[in-house]
Amino acid sequence: MMDSGMEEDVTLPGTLSGCSGLHPVLPSDLDVISDTTGLGNGVLPIMSEEKVSPTRARNMKDFENQITELKKENFNLKLRIYFLEERIQQEFAGPTEHIYKKNIELKVEVESLKRELQERDQLLVKASKAVESLAEGGGSEIQRVKEDARKKVQQVEELLTKRIHLLEEDVKAAQAELEKAFAGTETEKALRLSLESKLSAMKKMQEGDLEMTLALEEKDRLIEELKLSLKSKEALIQCLKEEKSQMASPDENVSSGELRGLSATLREEKERDAEERQKERNHFEERIQALQEDLREKEREIATEKKNSLKRDKAIQGLTMALKSKEKEVEELNSIIKELTADSTQSREAPLKTQVSEFEVRESENCEAALAEKEALLAKLHSENVTKNTENHRLLRNVKKVTQELNDLKKEKLRLERDLEEAHREGNRGARTIHDLRNEVEKLRKEVCEREKAVEKHYKSLPGESSSKFHSQEQVVKGLTESASQEDLLLQKSNEKDLEAIQQNCYLMTAEELKFGSDGLITEKCSQQSPDSKLIFSKEKQQSEYEGLTGDLKTEQNVYAHLAKNLQDTDSKLQAELKRVLALRKQLEQDVLAYRNLQTALQEQLSEIRKREEEPFSFYSDQTSYLSICLEEHSQFQLEHFSQEEIKKKVIDLIQLVKDLHADNQHLKKTIFDISCMGVQGNDRLESTKQAELMASKADEDTLKFKADDENHFQSDQHLEQSREIMEDYAEGGGKDGYVRHMDSNILDHDGAHTPDTSEDHSLEDELLSLLATFFSKKATPSLESRPDLLKALGALLLERICLAEQGSPGDHSDSKAEKALEQVAVRLRDELGHSCLANSFSKSHSELKSPRGTWLVKTGDEAKVELKSVSVQTMTIEDSTRGFKPERKREAWAGKPEEAVFSTELESEALGEMPGLQATHLSFPSAIDKDDQKTGLLIQLKTPELLENLYNLPASQEVVAQLQGQVLELQKELKEYKIRNKQLLDKLILAEAMMEGMAVPNSTPVNVPAAQAVVRTAFQGKPGEQEGHETTHSAGRDKEVDSDQYTSFEIDSEICPPDDLALLPACKENLEDFLGPPSIATYLDSKSQLSVKVSVVGTDQSENINLPDDTEALKQKIHDLQTELEGYRNIIVQLQKHSQCSEAIITVLCGTEGAQDGLNKPKGHIDEEEMTFSSLHQVRYVKHMKILRPLTPEIIDGKMLESLKQQLVEQEQELQKEQDLNLELFGEIHNLQNKFRDLSPSRYDSLVQSQARELSLQRQQIKDSHDICVVCHQHMSTMIKAFEELLQASDVDSCVAEGFREQLTQCAGLLEQLEKLFLHGKSARVEPHTQTELLRRLRTEEDNLPYQHLLPESPEPSASHALSDDEMSEKSFLSREPKPDSETEKYPTIASRFPQDLLMEHIQEIRTLRKHLEESIKTNEKLRKQLERQGCETDQGSTNVSAYSSELHNSLTSEIQFLRKQNEALSTMLEKGSKEKQKENEKLRESLARKTESLEHLQLEYASVREENERLRRDISEKERQNQQLTQEVCSSLQELSRVQEEAKSRQQLLLQKDELLQSLQMELKVYEKLAEEHQKLQQESRGEACGGGQKGQDPFSNLHGLLKEIQVLRDQAERSIQTNNTLKSKLEKQLSQGSKQAQEGALTLAVQALSVTEWSLQLDKHDVNKCPEASDNSFDLFESTQAMAPKSASETPVLSGTDVDSLSCDSTSSATSPSCMPCLVAGRHLWASKSGHHMLCLIEDYDALYKQISWGQTLLAKMDIQTQEALSPTSQKLGPKASFSVPLSKFLSSMNTAKLILEKASRLLKLFWRVSVPTNGQCSLHCDQIGEMKAEITKLHKKLFEQEKKLQNTAKLLQQSKHQEKIIFDQLVITHQVLRKARGNLELRPRAAHPGTSSPSRPGS
């Protein structure tokens, strides 16, 4: 509902804000809406009381205004709704009317709800406690829901584990069954062997059958011979009959007797033959019976084998069914798991929904805050759901990958099977080659024996040679070790020399030694640099020599390794010597490496020594705490080198020193007041000069507006801040005035800096400058103060001289008049100096104490700012004119800066010269800077003392202060306008500089802005780590330097690297090309080269470690090493997280959130102004730092200058001795005042500030160290990832392992990136709810400005600054323009802007403002006291009763001091209590962090153990899968062998059938012979009976016998052919089985068999008459038709006839016409079961019926044939007539035989339509095993994911509890501190008013 109000309505003519004054809800990055974005006409914004500042309270008037505005808006909305309804009724009168009405009603409801929410906004403050209780209750509910979900998940896990155990048991049972099956296969193998032996016996029996056939052939021949003899006898009989008929009757008796004898002989012969034949027949029958018995035994064995195979098939089917049931159970488990996951998600979502509904109800009743918290919780849970969804998607992807891998594995399995077959073939070939190899081995043995003899001879000669070589190498090694030791000594000596030189440098850093010996230091530095460079060159040469030597040693190592391999077995002494040589070589390499390490360590020491020389300056320049600013003189000690006790002692000493300084300061103030009373007469004149100066500065400022460009405006803005810093340095300089020191050093610097070309022209100027230098070195301030007319004259003369120098040509520089006038002025000043030294000598007694002008400058800071601004304006105009006259001169890197910045940094550096150790290090300028800069410097130096004098003598009149305030306000307004323009120019300038830096880098190929950013980042990331070496702590000042530069223009780079490694970014756009000169690029490239060296070292180490492995074992070892490295990195990350959490907690409490709320409340102009002032401050500080670090060159120092300096020092010493005598007298008088003001030290207030600053610096140092470590780790991780990718490309690794390891590496890299971002920007996750949408919107709208987002100096949120109202800002600018940058305002702007807790931010802001108020109140008290003192002095002048007034003033002062002391003590005790409580809280937080880290480590150990267990389980599963695969392969091979045996048995059965047919034919032949014999006997009887009658009726039986004999011959020929074809087919089958191509040839063989049978039967049918066999002629078409239906090649392609084919093959012979039959196909759904090795048959029911009919018909035919044979053999048929009864049964018998054969052929054809099946097949068994493995893998993966998710839930719950606890503690502590500080503020505001009711104190900020 809130979102609908933000969008515009399409139906409205304009937006809602257009007519009613309502504004849409602004983006929530503005937490507090300003007045301009309020509710229309200046009404106060609606905000919670938490967000209102404590100083601002809302009245009833504000609420009334708000209510009236709401009423107006309500009325406007009603009118608008009315008109809209009318318009909608007019325009949309159709069916869409109700939709628009509903839309309008919803909008009305939305607006009403908004109004209700706004009205309930005030109740939020009252309901905060209820919200906390609700939040705690909600947390408990969430915990309860999580615990329920956890219990459910545990139950699911237990169920899953139980199911997994059951499945494992089932798998074990299946394995046992498989083992049983394997034992069964072994028994089958034994049976198969026995069958093969029996088959061999059968073959032998077949050879016996061949002998039988030979015997039968011989009998056939005998039969034919007998037939021929019968024919001859028949011919004889006929002849005899003829003769008998011819012979007469008398001869009949004789012929009959002969005939009787012949017949008797014939009968005897026939009887003998018959007996012999009967014997043979009986013998054959016995043989046939024996063969039949053998056949029956074999059939029994085959039947038993079939039964066993059926049992095995059943067992396999049972196993497959069990496996299918297991698969179903696994699927059910998966479905249960899915349901449980869905239930868990629903159970998580349901309580969340209920909670949301409850919170909505409570929200409508109570407040909106609870809803916000619940929405945050919902967002977290939603993010968790999103992460879980992503994990599920990733799991699905993994599952897909696993399936793909399984498919690949299957393909590989097939390929491996093929390879196995090929290996079998190769094994056969290898068996052949074994014999050849054995022969070759014998030959080789002989050769080896010969070679061994030769080697023994050679070995005898080798020891002498090796010993000589060894001695020579020992000498070389000794020489190398001696040279290495010498170089080590040289290195140690050089190190000692460097250390001595550095110690000397450190000891020489005192003031007097530097004054007297600056040229000696320069020469020492030059002499140190030259031997360093020589040493570096010599070291490089030695390093190259060592590399050559190491290369030679590596070659020698290879040679010796080869020798060691040859001599391993024979000579052990040589091996020991070689090992010694290798050990020596390793020692030498270690020495070389140690030398290199020493070299690098020396370089690091040198760099650290240089840094130590530089670090005091950086520490001083960027120290941000109040105490460090007050005590800049004592910055020579560094906190990091001391222990805690030493630091405490130092702090106590510093506090004592500050007290002494304060007391001396008060005493000096008193004396200065007395002296100022004496010089009252000159004050009137000074007022007029001051006002004239102010007018001049105003005029100069007006001219600046029109003349100077944008860059000069920016520089003028810099000058304001620089002048403040000058005043600060001046205030802290003690009795030695800052401008005097500056003038002195400037003269010294520029005296030697001018070019030698103008030496003649400038000789007079040099003399003048030396005079002025002596004048200023004598500290001529009192004379200048008393003589302002002299100052004005000197300034005018200098101005005149500079103008003349600018107008004239470069050769006309010297004007004699002006020079003479300047000399006269200098002489006058020197004369007056001698007179004024005695009167003003007291100011030089305590040169270390602060001058009273420090306090005056604090009081009148704004007036001084205006005056100094006018000075800077004048110098700018002058320098612009000089820039126009000399454009042709060349500048170096320092010339790129504007002259004003140079001047200001010079002033600051001179202020720094007051520190011990830096007094004589005067800054040097390059020769390119001209004398014009010197003159402008002199002018300003002459103008600043005059200005300060005016400020010092200014009376405290309210009118002048008001005028000055008005002028300052006008100037500030103009500055704001200029700064807006400067911002735009700065943005362009920074982008151009980044582009130029990207072009300057040689490695960056594309010149675009993101590339430049990347180059800059990578260039400076490695620098801090290299500077610090292996140290873990840095100087606190360097950290603050980094943090202070976060406000500079180049924000990103200064966050990473310290600014002394960067070239300064210029403020002027014109000098950009000059800025990017060779020196700046050199410094940039130097830092980058150091980084690249470090990275290359890591890369080379990584590349040297990578040797491409050939085997997987080496790869596994590599992966293991990488995993150990990963563990190490994870431990490092854990430690870094500890440090980061500690540091974040401290930073957020101390200073992390000061500026975010302030920047939101502040107007934009003030934010811009403070940002620019911060940037200019840090730029100036950096310039100062760089100039201090720049070494002095020997050209600057001149001999004359040194002599003049020495003379001046001698004179000053004499004067100091005089002054010290006077000071001893004055010391007793001043001692009483010192005791009075001793207790007013501000150090007591600032001790806490100092401790906080020190803690902050240490914490930020830790963050910086951890960031450097993160950078190094991230680089190392990237190199590791590259190396791992190269490993994967170089060798074959398991893709799953590689993917897992790659994911781990990427996760580690992501963690390191997150840590880097965290250390750079702080917490980015806990942003306010609006920041994500805001970022998305900005990314969409500002895609073109992507480079600016990285380079612009302004952050998206306003910068951290003091949040005060406009009045407070103005008063703050008038009263307390402190030059010191507050440590809290500069630290961590990004963390401060991103901290989400508004309440915490407001409390911390209040703490800061209260601390400010406290400091300001102390300062105002001091100011009031000073005013009282001054008024007392003024009244003392006019009054005579001085002692009475002074006593009263003394009493009031003492009472005030006592009161302030008590108040300060109370405040200090409160602050100590607060600090102790904070320390306790910090200790508690640390303890909780330690516990958390311990729990994390424990969890990591558990995770490692679980991972190891999972890996072990995976290995076990893989081994089991391999075993299962092996078993399945063995089962498949055994089944194939069984099928082959069965096929062989089938072939044997066919042979037996053929033999049965032969036996039947033989039986038939025997029966025929018997019949022939019987008929022959009958014929003989008939012939006897008809011998007398002579009938001729015996021809019919003979003719029938001839036909029968022909048929028998045809049958015999057919049987012989079939036997021959069977033998050939058998031989072919054996060959094909041996070759393994049986499957391809089966179809062809069956076709050949059918073709042969068809040809045989066709021949038979052609030979016979149609009349003799009518049934055969009818069924002949069926026979030919059967040839067209070809047999399939394999059982899987076994055909099934269609309906038409079945009809054509039916029993009805008439319907079986020659219809074309197509190739049949398998029955749908059954071909999956078809296999060769199946033990079941499958067919269509039609085919089965047809086969049944054929078999029944055949049975009937056989029964008829049996009847016919019985009738033929019965004695009744023999008794009947033989002629008629013989021919008819024989023809019937033959026709029935033919039909029986046709029936058998049809039956065989129908049998071919049956095919073998097995349910289920072996392939499915293997698939089932694979599926079980997949399911197990999925179950284990799901188990792991559940475990990981549970761990994540537990960790998040713990983190939530800990964060809530921490927030509660912080909130309680902040409430306590808030109350304490509020009491303190009340005390501070009430007490001064009670103490001074009459005095008018200035308005305080925040009042």
Curated annotation (Swiss-Prot):
Chain positions covered by the region annotation CM1 motif: 51-94
Modified residues (Phosphoserine): 485, 544, 1241, 1243, 1495, 1673, 1676, 1903
Pfam families, alphabetized: CC_CDK5RAP2, Cnn_1N
Lineage top rank: taxon: Eukaryota
Biased composition (Basic and acidic residues): 266-282, 1025-1043, 1370-1387
Keyword Disulfide bond tagged: no
UniProt subcellular location: Cytoplasm, Cytoskeleton, Microtubule organizing center, Centrosome; Golgi apparatus; Cytoplasm
Post-translational events: Phosphorylated in vitro by CDK5.
Modified residues (Phosphothreonine): 1193
Gene Ontology molecular function terms on file: calmodulin binding; gamma-tubulin binding; microtubule binding; protein kinase binding; protein-containing complex binding; transcription cis-regulatory region binding; tubulin binding
Primary site of residence: cytoplasm
Region of interest (Required for centrosomal attachment, Golgi localization and CALM1 interaction), residue spans: 1736-1903, 1871-1880
BP GO terms, sorted: brain development; centriole replication; centrosome cycle; chromosome segregation; establishment of mitotic spindle orientation; microtubule bundle formation; microtubule cytoskeleton organization; microtubule organizing center organization
Keywords (A to Z) from UniProt: Calmodulin-binding, Cytoplasm, Cytoskeleton, Golgi apparatus, Phosphoprotein
Stretches the record annotates as Disordered: 244-282, 1022-1044, 1349-1387, 1883-1903
Gene Ontology cellular-component terms listed: cell junction; centrosome; ciliary basal body; cytoplasm; cytosol; gamma-tubulin ring complex; Golgi apparatus; microtubule
Subunit structure: Homodimer. Interacts with CDK5R1 (p35 form). CDK5RAP1, CDK5RAP2 and CDK5RAP3 show competitive binding to CDK5R1. May form a complex with CDK5R1 and CDK5. Interacts with pericentrin/PCNT; the interaction is leading to centrosomal and Golgi localization of CDK5RAP2 and PCNT. Interacts with AKAP9; the interaction targets CDK5RAP2 and AKAP9 to Golgi apparatus. Interacts with TUBG1; the interaction is leading to the centrosomal localization of CDK5RAP2 and TUBG1. Interacts with TUBGCP3. Interacts with CALM1. Interacts with CDC20.
Its job: Potential regulator of CDK5 activity via its interaction with CDK5R1. Negative regulator of centriole disengagement (licensing) which maintains centriole engagement and cohesion. Involved in regulation of mitotic spindle orientation. Plays a role in the spindle checkpoint activation by acting as a transcriptional regulator of both BUBR1 and MAD2 promoter. Together with EB1/MAPRE1, may promote microtubule polymerization, bundle formation, growth and dynamics at the plus ends. Regulates centrosomal maturation by recruitment of the gamma-tubulin ring complex (gTuRC) onto centrosomes.
Name assigned to this protein: CDK5 regulatory subunit-associated protein 2
Recorded name of the encoding gene: Cdk5rap2
